Curated annotation (Swiss-Prot):
Composition skew (Low complexity), residue ranges: 1162-1178
Residues engaged in binding ATP: 178-185
Family: Belongs to the TRAFAC class myosin-kinesin ATPase superfamily. Kinesin family. KIF27 subfamily.
Family matches, as PANTHER family: CHROMOSOME-ASSOCIATED KINESIN KIF4A-RELATED
Name assigned to this protein: Kinesin-like protein costa
Gene: cos
UniProtKB keywords: ATP-binding, Coiled coil, Cytoplasm, Cytoskeleton, Microtubule, Motor protein, Nucleotide-binding, Repressor
Amino acid sequence: MEIPIQVAVRICPYTEPSENRKPVAGAEADASAFGNAEAKAESFSDSEDNKNDASNRQRPEESTDANGNSEGGRQLKKETLPTDSNGNENGTIVPLGSGCCVQAIPISASALGLPSALPGGRAQDSIAAGLIQVGAHTVPVTHALGSGTTQSQLYYQTVFPLISLFLEGFDASVVTYGQRGQGKTYTLYGPGFECVYGEADQGVVQRCVRDIFAHIAGHSERTYAVNVGFVEICEGEVCDLLDMGNVHCQSVEEVFRWLQIGLATRQPKSAHSLFTLTLEQQWVSKEGLIQHRLSTASFSDLCATERWGEPPPGNPRDAGLQMLELVVNTLTDPSIMYGVNGNIPYGQTTLTTLLKDSFGGRAQTLVILCVSPQEQHVAETLGNLQFAFKVQCVRNYVIMNTYSDDNTPISPETMPNGSSNPGAGPLAQVAAGDNFGLQFAASQWFKLVSNAEGLFAKLMASNLISELEKEQIEEWLFLKQECEECLSSTEAMRSQKQLVPIQEAEEPEESVSEPPNSDNDTDNESQRPDLADKLESLMEEFRAKTDALIQSKHAEFLTKHPKAVMQSQERDKESKLDAPPEKDKEKIEERKTSIAGRRRSIQPGASLSTAELALLNRVALQQPTAQPPPSVLDPESSIDPLESSAGEGLRQAAIAAAAANAPIEQLQKKLRKLHAEIEGRQRQLKEIEQTMQVKQNIISELVKNSDTRSHAKQRFQKKKAKLEAECDKAKKHLAKALIQGREKGETERWSAIIAHIEHRLEDLSSMKHIAGESGQKLKKLQQSMAESRKQQEELEKKIRKESKLRDQLETELAKLKESRDGASGGKELVKLDSPEQQGRQLKAVQARITHLNHILREKSDNLEECAGGEGPAPAQQESLRHEIRNLRGTRDLLLDERCHLDRKLKRDKMLTQREERKLLECDEAIEAIDAAIEFKNELICGHKSIDTSDRLQREKGEQMLMARLNKLSPEEMRTLLYKYFNKVIDLRDSSRKLELQLVQLERERDAWEWKERVLSNAVRQARLEGERNAVLLQRQHEMKLTLMLRHLAEETSASSASYGERALAPGHQTSSGDFDYELDFYKAAATTTTTTNHKALVKPPKSTPSGAALEKYKDKEQRGAGRNIFAKFQVLTRYASSAASAAAAGSCSSTVDESTALIESTTTATATTTTTTTTTTTGGKGKERGLPNIRQDQLKRLMPAPTVTKVTRQKNKIIIQDASRRN
């Protein structure tokens, strides 16, 4: 809902100055408003500059607010003025000659038929719009209020509609704007809460509060929560006037009480104030739905505009008001909006940030402009009216803040029981099952705390706050983190409680009574660390059951399926297997050739040994028994052993062996990687366990020694308080010496003493901080323990997973090795153990016999065709057989040469480049001879030639190529064949070299991967070892630091003598009352003169103390520091400072220097001193002056406390050495 901002202009009442009234100095003679409020405001502002002027003082019962507005101003009694037909008061429009130039021209709504703004009000009360006329200028506004408008009329006409929307769940905002002394604060808050004023003068805020609580009382079925807040913005800083944040209120009286406290706390200087009231409501609608609404009403009292500069209207002096005008200009001017790309500068100032919802936001806004009718304020009035006119063009996107819980019907258990008391507290009547309001409030508080955390972080980074404030902020941040942990644990419990099973309507109640427990058990198990193992085991079980179910269903389907369909499926399969398409054939052949040629030149199984070659020759030359004569010999039967002897079968066997070895090698490689990973992770796990044990020891020691640290901190605090008191005394004496104009040496001495005490105070603060940071260390160690525990769980999970994978790979590797060994020993007879294996073997033999019968039948048919004369002539067949024998002889020679090269390769492990090429030529020539023998055998069998059988199916280009080849002469054909033969050899040679390079690169990659794995494990191991060593050092440091702090506490308590007790001796004559403080402790010049039964301390004559005495005392203390325990404490503090600044390495050195200075100065503070007694003589240059005698108790008080730390220091030294030796 897009609604423009409403503007109401209220003219301040004007009264002619009385002639007999004494004019107020500094104020304008004609400035008077609600009960001389303006004159009073001017006098208040002038009184800041002229405080001694008696004429600036006003009556004590009249006061102004922080903005100079009249809070106690009351309207003067004004005669009843006649009204015109429109209900306008003619008497309020003062002519220009009388000093007023602003007129309000309200437009009555009675003629328009609009309802009255007041319930049952008159016609003149129903003002809908109006004009403000300033001289010749006229400005239209939403509400034009004359000087005679009362507080009640203003409220019901302008503010009451906003409060109605506020009670429905919309945000509302009321902003007062104007120059100084025109009644802005009076409009909002009235004259105050004094009993002398009636309710008729109450402001807008009080009336809104009464209406809100009246509405609450009238709807007793609703639960509610009302919170108020009151802040002040002064020079960009936000100040909480209530010092409580948002305060919960249950009645009108409580709100008024807090409002009165806030008004009394406001600053007298110019500032903005913001009073907010938040209403949270919840009820059940007639449809049974839970309705939840949250609305906020803000009342902003802005400071005076005080425009200045050129052009004449000028700009407000306040930076917040200037930025507010810039925001309004941006919202109303499309060119400016386009220039900033839609980024409205709300965040430039604090005021615009807080008023973001009021101007261009989601609140219904009313701006009340208070103007002056006087001529001298015309420029500022026009400027403010121009701003108000622009504000009316701003549109807010008003929405209802409702939360209906996704239209969830409320259950009978969560219905409110009976009528609830409105004053019972926030959401007190909500049933136990409905905690939505509390959850929403918690979320809102979480947002506020997050914003506060950001502000605190900025303050910490700005370095504009003291150390005490920093400690408070750090403590607040730790408390916030603890609250977040508590909330996270409660959220987890809540999420577990909300996971309930869905109850089916048709199931009985007994069946649904048990599942919640099982669900809760599973939810609880989800928090356990062994969840992954259980889940994996369940997945394996599920997978096995699924496979078994699929197999059973498949078997059942096969048994129940019709045989006709099964036969049709088998015929389809057979047709597909018998007649594959030619493209598939070509792909299969290409795949076979690629597999056969892949790495054949470098695999040892591809070569033929001498024994194998002899065996193959015997098989080739031997004629098998029970076969037909050579004339009718089956050519294919004669080529089968040749094909096997040609190396195809052995090649296939070599390829199969290589294929069998490849997965074994891959598995072995994976196993090596897994072994390395498991060993590395086990070492890391061991390091983490040791580190966790050391951390746990540190935590237990910190908890055990917390009392010692707190005791030391208290001692340091007491010592710091004593030193602060001594510093204050020294400063007083220094000021006294400066006022009395004493000698320069004494002032320098006091200045040196003060500087020394302040230095000691800084050292004590640092020591107190070191003693008090055990809580932070404990929290950090606990967080580190949690992180280490998480790392331990992750490592254990990875180790279990990798161990399981290793077992699987080992099982698979064992199976592969068994299968390979069984294949290599295939010549041996294997006894079948089970009848199933015998049945499978029998089926395989029967299938082989069937296949051989089919081959024999085909070959007999071929023989019959040859005998019938379909094949070539007998002479031609004999010629072809002769050529085949010649080719076999050539092939045998090539095989002998190849075997010779193989033996040389096995013996020497390398060949020359020419021999490698010769080996490839032999392989290729053997393959070519095999192809030629196969071609001639096909000719003998009467098959068509390969070149002519598929000529009709060739493309046109191939046909032309074959025609050209057929026309070539034998010489040309041999030349072409030799050329392509060399090209094939070159290609195979390059392929072999590439394969060798690939193998080498793969080996290098494996080596680099192994190195990388080893190095990464070493780095992780080193990191964990370093962490463990650091924790060990920290433990040693904490032990030593605890002993040092215990000893320091004892020394601090023992050294009870302070600067006040060690009197400081001045350099000139002082009174006897200051004698105890003026004894010079830093200077061993105190003398004792023994008179008749009296001991007196006499100052040296004409002695002028200087900084040398202080330096002498410091040197003496530093010499004694060698025997003090602070020498060891310095080393410990250096470690603490470096550990504390681990995030910023650059600050380590400065921290060490500060710790060193801390130890040296603390040594000075705890060293015991002795007073040196000297005898004064009468031969001095100056005149001796006797001092009054001192009693014995005073002398005892001046004596330093005896040292009690010598024995304790030796004990602690022995303890530290023993602890270091054990660690």
